[in-house]
C-alpha cells in the first residue's frame, strides 16, 4: 500500500486528497499545513486525524513513502529537496521556483 503525506491543504491539496482517496492501495497518512491549528474543523470534515503545521513531520515520518507538495509556489523547492533527501517519492505542483 502506498502511504501518502500531503503538504499544503488549501484548494489544490484538498483536490489531491479527494483523488487519492479514490485510488486502491493508497492511504493518506498525514497532512501538514502552516495554518493547521486554525483548520481543525476542515480536517474533521475530511476525516483527517493526523495533521501538523510543520511539513518536516511529513518528511520525517518513516511510514510515508510519497509526498504531495501542494504548498505555495515559493516553498516548492525547499520542500522537494528535503523530501528527496529523505528518500520520498514526490508529486509537486508546478512551478518549482
Residue ranges of model-derived segments:
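Beta-loop-alpha module in the N-terminal Rossmann-like domain of NAD(P)-dependent dehydrogenases
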Residues: 46-97
Amino acid at each position: 500500500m502506498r502511504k501518502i503525506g500531503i503538504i499544503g491543504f488549501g484548494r489544490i491539496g484538498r483536490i489531491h486528497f479527494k483523488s487519492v482517496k479514490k485510488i486502491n492501495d493508497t492511504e493518506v497518512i498525514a497532512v501538514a499545513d502552516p495554518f493547521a491549528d486554525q483548520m481543525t474543523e476542515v480536517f474533521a470534515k475530511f476525516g483527517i486525524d493526523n495533521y501538523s503545521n510543520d511539513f518536516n513531520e511529513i518528511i520525517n515520518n518513516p511510514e510515508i513513502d510519497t509526498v504531495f507538495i501542494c504548498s505555495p509556489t515559493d516553498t516548492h523547492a525547499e520542500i522537494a529537496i528535503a523530501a528527496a533527501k529523505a528518500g520520498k517519492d514526490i508529486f509537486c505542483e508546478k512551478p518549482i521556483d
